[in-house]
Amino acid sequence: MTRTDAIAQPKSPTDPFTHHDGPPPSPWLMAMEFRAFWEFGSIVPFWPLLQRAPVGDGHPVIVFPGLSASDGSTVPLRSYLSTRNYEVSGWNQGHNFGPRAGVLEAGSHQIHEAFLKAGKRTVSLIGWSLGGIYARELAKLHPEWVRCVITLGTPFSGAPESTNAWRLFRLTSGRDIKSESRRFQLPVAPPVPTTSIFSRTDGIVAWQGSLQRPSKANPNTENIEVIASHLGIGMNPSAMWAVADRLAQPEGAWQAFGRKGGLRGLLYPDPAR
């Protein structure tokens, strides 16, 4: 499969979808990452509301954790999606220390096994932060096995240094982040329905680096903004609801997320504003 795509050009230098080469989030936003504890704690009071999200059709879902995290970090999200009638699994590769040798190969094998086990039903891929890079790239490699891709705070369209985690990446992976970024066309969307969930108050990843630019090759892409921290976005009730809503769409009948009506306009700001 060739990794080419007709990416729409930005309308002007102020276009929100311009490739982000700016600085990472400010020290103030980074200090506010402690909000993740509140986001985790808010799952319990919001649980009855979360249970009103659409119920799925039982297709398989794989969730990829962020940098240095393991499947333990995605337990709240995976547990919730299990109640929405999905066959959910973690990535089963321990801690995510970057694109080590064999990581993508193991991911490919896992997706194929899930695809076959489900009777050749396509698999939805969800990735938190760096895990979203894996989800996107694996979907590019194997679109015939993948139903949709959803990323949470994933920096795929910005310069490597536009995150506050690039030094941690180099330390844990032993690799140069610029070299790794050049190996892939990260801003290019996979050829499947693709959703990027991001937050302008992300203290680790510059939010502009999580914006999916419009694509002529794949019109089924979107950005959903939530109010969340980076470390808590995978446990944030608004993000969890959006994930469940996206997964519940009938295969082959993708529609963009409806953020208008009721409280949605407050919980999900306009990402293009």
Segments and roles (model prediction):
Residues 43-46, 112, 116, 173-174, ...:
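Generic surface-pattern signal
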Residues 94-96:
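Glycine-rich phosphate/ribose-binding loops and adjacent secondary-structure elements
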Residues 140-273:
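Helical cap/lid subdomain of alpha/beta-hydrolase-fold lipid enzymes
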Residues 98-100, 232-233:
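A generic structural signal for short coil/turn motifs at secondary-structure boundaries
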Residues 1-62, 74, 79, 84, ...:
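Flexible, membrane-associating and regulatory peripheral segments of lipid-active enzymes
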Residues 59-72, 76, 82-91, 100-192, ...:
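Serine-dependent carboxylesterase/thioesterase catalytic core
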